[in-house]
Amino acid sequence: ENASLASLERIIYKGYTHTAKEKQSVKESFEKMHVKTPTLDTAISTLSGGNQQKVLLARWLLCEPDIMILDEPTRGIDVGAKFEIYKMMVELAKKGIAIIMISSELPEVMGMSDRIMVVSKGRITGTYTKDEIDAGSVTQNNLLSSALQEV
């Protein structure tokens, strides 16, 4: 139930939850995200950090969003779960879903982004393109300098 909260309008019919449709949607979403759980009814709090993060992403993917804002999507999770989340982000971007990723891990930002916008004190202090990143003209020091710039 927890995994389908964000998409209730898709599984409620005449005021009642369509349980079979809900379970099928959650099952498919969990399979796409490679969530490892004994059953769909397992409490999310009992799962590993990586699987908890994947459940949260699966929940929002059920809504079929046009834009996803991911704040520290891989903080504190194992390498395997990070890979799954990165893979999901690439697949979503290929489908035309815009992803705004907020991360304090600069190598992650540089590796995953088509464009990087550095924000400091509510203002954009630097913008970098994928071409600049790939050409090596953008370094972690450039990003940090932009972040520490006086606005």
How should each PLM-predicted stretch be described?
Residues E1-V151:
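Glycine-rich phosphate-binding loops of nucleotide-dependent enzymes
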